[in-house]
């Protein structure tokens, strides 16, 4: 089976590449060159028939991922499908099913069947439920069976925590972290390694893993098991040692034509973000960087979508290629529909703010909004806003008598005042 990367290396411009080139207004040569060298990826499993392809990486708009899925405390697949609909409504490019309870294949199959967004999973979450074994009873090859079934079902990318091998685990043990390992998949693998006194199965059998990905053109999202879960732990030896391991695994995947993106922090002080983005790009030779936040403070409980959006904007401006959304429910509970909506909007704002910095052409929509404000064209403003529905609702809640202003400024609307005076008209505030 040939992958998007293999095709690009051969100079073959696939249907998926054509769609991405049109969406991003990029040339054929630019896209082929950067997919071939791994700086751009197009996650597109051959079995995901409903996919509307998107690219992630160098020279492209920053993409946004939405996490959803059930847990043992909240098993309501119908609500999770409503979250999918909400993600589609806002034009989200990626959705990850992080279900970690019970038999998840039916929901995953439905997700692949209906979603035009690329679908990601974390197979290790599904291991206990799929295999019907407790963690200690699972053997190394069992984990690969789960990966195979996820790949066959049509998921476009998988988070695989292959970098927390025995070397990285040794460095972690020597670190003095406040929050240890906060990655769910990473903590499960570390626990398995310790209980079995064995190497990480995804690292030990990495070539077998690559064979599975090659068969279905699954993109590897190399997970950061040792990402910092607190600002205190950011940029420490454990995090960086794993990143070095991921850089080596990236090259091995590229050698056989498998697309890769790298997952990143996490929690991180705002002044460390740019250096971390540059470090990933340097070590991993430009592989796309997919970050969770980063959250720039640890005390924003209930408002972590704001902490994440602040960090996400800086990360995107500094080179991050995809942002994983953070909701107000982060660290507290499974998010509800309103949490998901707020997380989506906050993260889309962060992604766009970053794009204005690194892709000047992305300012055009902002200029249109400014023009609409100057012209006091409310309908156009609602249309251009990231969440125009909420903008219109808020405007109408205190709708002004004179539509040449809003209820904030009334007759003292600066836009209206200047429009009148520059046309040579008198301004009356009475």
From Swiss-Prot:
One of its GO terms (cellular component) is cytosol. The keyword 4Fe-4S applies. Substrate binds at residues 67, 96, 125, 161, 183-185, 224-227, 263, 290. Catalyzes the synthesis of the hydroxymethylpyrimidine phosphate (HMP-P) moiety of thiamine from aminoimidazole ribotide (AIR) in a radical S-adenosyl-L-methionine (SAM)-dependent reaction. Pfam families: ThiC_Rad_SAM (PF01964). It comes from the Bacteria. Belongs to the ThiC family. It is an enzyme of class 4 (lyase). GO terms for biological process: thiamine biosynthetic process; thiamine diphosphate biosynthetic process. The gene is thiC. This is Phosphomethylpyrimidine synthase.
